[in-house]
Amino acid sequence: MSTKPSSEETPDLQGAFPRLSDAQIAALDAQGQRRPIQPGDVLFAEGDRESDFFVILAGKVASVDGKGTPEERVIAVHGRGRFLGELSLLTGEGAWYSAVAVDAGEVLAVPVGRLRELVARDPAFGDLILRAYLLRRSILIGLGAGLRIVGSKYSPDTRRVRDFAARNRLPYRWLDLEADSSAEAVAAQFGVTPQDTPVVIVHGRLLRNPSNAELAAAIGLPAPSEPQASCDMLVVGSGPAGL
């Protein structure tokens, strides 16, 4: 993990960064558009909800968490034959990091709708992409990328927000007001009082004690369903029908 893009490609040790075959790239090439890239070009930015599926044909591209902030860091660097993105590309969530060109090259941009059509015709190709995206999401969760949740471990609302993130496999970092020294710095940066907590920082936006529905909308997830009312039923009588 570094704070500035390197030209060295990140090794694929877990299967999260597979390289597509020439045949797979050719199939995608028929459905997409080639684009030249220059160092510093942003292919998609954190928070973007509409992005193409990018395959690197030449050059290298870095996945950058927190681009433009003091906490900016490089998650991975990809070279020829690798594809970009993670699970959010398929779920409609805002992107959890930015993709930034490290050096000059060329990428293939395929609309997500066309990608879905290819996946439907080639299940093995779909399995490759889905497995890689699931592993990438796990990496983000392990790194504490994505959301920042600031709140007390004694707060029921803090537990609710953290449970929501965990249920939806969202990458997040929890800053405990009682134990994490950086929580105070974040609170001061955004002018947050203890009464405002828990707060959630998502794609640069501050949410004060958001409901699950508000948090879902900010992320790009469908609104969570309301809990169904339940009641007891009493059956009175006897006999085979129980009536």
What are the functions of these language-model segments?
Residues 140-146, 222-230:
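Short domain-boundary/entry signatures in modular proteins, especially
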Residues 203-224:
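Non-catalytic, surface beta->alpha helical segment in thiol-disulfide oxidoreductase systems
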Residues 227-241:
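Beta1/beta-strand and adjacent pyrophosphate-binding region of the FAD-binding site
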Residues 1-151, 155-163:
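Cytosolic regulatory regions built on CNB/CRP/Popeye-like sensor folds
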Residues 189-201:
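Structural micro-motif
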Residues 128, 139, 184-185, 218:
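Rhodanese-like catalytic fold shared by cysteine-dependent sulfurtransferases
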Residues 148-187:
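Short, thiol/selenol-centered motifs that function as redox-active sites or metal-ligating centers
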Residues 84, 175, 238-243:
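Gly/lys/ser-thr-rich phosphate-binding loops in alpha/beta enzymes
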